[in-house]
Curated annotation (Swiss-Prot):
Lineage, highest ranks first: Eukaryota, Metazoa, Chordata, Craniata, Vertebrata
Annotated region (Disordered), positions in chain: 227-254
Cysteine pairings via disulfide bonds: C104-C174, C111-C151, C144-C188, C157-C170
Post-translational modification: Not N-glycosylated.
GO cellular component: external side of plasma membrane; extracellular region; interphotoreceptor matrix
Function: Riboflavin-binding protein which might have a role in retinal flavin transport.
UniProt keyword annotations, A-Z: Cell membrane, Disulfide bond, Extracellular matrix, Membrane, Secreted, Signal
Organism encoding this protein: Ictidomys tridecemlineatus (Thirteen-lined ground squirrel)
Subcellular localization, as worded in the UniProt entry: Secreted, Extracellular space, Extracellular matrix, Interphotoreceptor matrix; Cell membrane
Name listed for the protein in its UniProt record: Retbindin
Amino acid sequence: MACRSHIQPSDLACTMQLALAWIILGACGGSHQFQARSQGHLGLASNLGTNQVQLAGDLQASGPQPYMMIQDPDSQAFPLPEPCCPSEMDTPETSGPGIFPPRCRTPSSGCESFLGHLQRALRNRFHLLLLGVRQAPPLCEELCQNWFATCEADITCGRTWLWPSGKRSCEGRCRTYGQTFADGVDLCRSVLGHILPVAAPGSRHCLNISISLLPRPRPGRWARETISQRSRRRGTGILDAGGSGSGSGSGSGP
């Protein structure tokens, strides 16, 4: 059963699980440095056309960041869980407390950005639960499919990111999303379980991440040359048409 919004003893456990999911997304996915205070002005906005709740706001520049500990300025720091796929890591231990060593592979910018947006969505959902707001919407199927497509070639912690025993279920070697999950729905249900249920296909009231917020890959040299050649061809065609018209006009004159 999905977590309800009213803060009662049982719901408090759901709220804490949701906070853990928010933390694990950074630990397994590679996102921005976690801090106790909110950064940026991101929130949830309702799409009146589809009744879907989407992440909205200004996103600060993002890029691969080192894995740091969660730290509250008013409390002692505590480290995040161990990094994913430790068996393939051949790196010395870090000197600072609570700092993650590198993982198997640096995450792609697209996957890292997507997980950063998803973390913010979880944070907003967490706040709604604490405020006693009505039950937050489930994840849109489109969000799960976009997550899978964006991170398909990236490394994942395993099929389950939330463990009752507190231990990871990493296999002997690092595996990609594509090797681990069948599709986006399988990804969401396996990774986040009942904490963030997936809405039925075509549902109009669910949590989605607008693709327009994600960074688009810059076109390569070949793509830029192709676009430039097409532009020149279009421009030449227009000039030729104009020139022939001008020539026809001059020829018909006295």
